[in-house]
Design a protein with these regions (language model features):
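N-terminal type II signal-anchor transmembrane helix
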Residues: 2-44
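A structural signal for short, hydrophobic/glycine-enriched beta-strand patches
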Residues: 29-189
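A transmembrane-helix-recognition feature enriched in membrane-embedded lipid enzymes
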Residues: 186-209
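Residue-level recognition of hydrophobic positions within alpha-helical transmembrane segments
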Residues: 7, 24, 70, 185-188, ...
Length: 211
């Protein structure tokens, strides 16, 4: 009897796991397809937008306290856009009390200034604790109807989908892809798959709460 119950439990767990993996794969494909023609890696391909939305991260890794390449490359991308006159203002959105005690927007602001971006064109949003909040705040708090998202491509794809499916009054949102680190931990990919699955749940809950 116990063996039969155990077998049934294993089958149910296996089925649930397989269904979850399939669902995550489908979510990933939907996000990638939606971003086609809207994310750009070449500076000449990007259109002018007054504001660039720079998505926050910490300057040093949580483990090992090493320089965070994701941070460095996002700063470089934002500086490139500003110096190429593709944006006039940089809205830095992240957690003001991020991991390891870092204030993400302030850290990014300091790095942008060090790279020659004037302080007066940098706006901080310390309430961007998650990507979906950064997108919502850009529209609802800062009144932006269009902007250029700045992050790594996988992050941009998810942010674009959120921007277009939150029911916000947006037009002309695009994304500029920061360089991605050569050595990427596989956990980054796993986390992104999970984040894309969670994103659809977030969008559903946001829609329900908005009605």
């Amino acid at each position: 009897m116990m063996k039969k119950v155990l077998k049934t439990c294993i089958k149910v767990i296996g089925f649930a796991l397989m269904a979850s993996l399939i669902m995550l794969f489908v979510c990933d494909r939907i996000v990638i397809r939606n971003a086609q023609g809207k994310t750009f890696s070449g500076i000449d391909s990007i259109k002018y937008n007054k504001v660039g939305l720079l998505l926050g991260t910490i300057p040093r890794t949580r483990i090992g306290n090493r320089p965070n390449s994701f941070f460095t490359y996002r700063i470089q991308a934002a500086v490139e856009l500003y110096k190429a006159k593709k944006i006039d203002v940089i809205l830095v959105s992240g957690a003001e009390n991020g991991p390891n005690g870092f204030n993400e927007p302030e850290c990014m602001k300091d790095s942008l200034i060090a790279c020659g971006v004037p302080e007066e064109v940098i706006i901080l949003d310390g309430k961007g604790y998650r990507t979906i909040l950064s997108v919502i705040n850009a529209n609802r708090v800062f009144g932006l109807g269009s902007f250029t998202i700045i992050s790594q491509q996988f992050h941009n794809e998810r942010a674009l989908y959120q921007a277009e499916h939150l029911g916000l009054n947006l037009n002309g949102v695009q994304a500029y892809n920061a360089q991605k680190p050569i050595s990427r931990n596989i956990w980054i990919d796993v986390r992104e798959y999970l984040a894309r699955g969670r994103m659809f749940l977030d969008l559903l809950l946001y829609e329900v709460n908005s009605n």
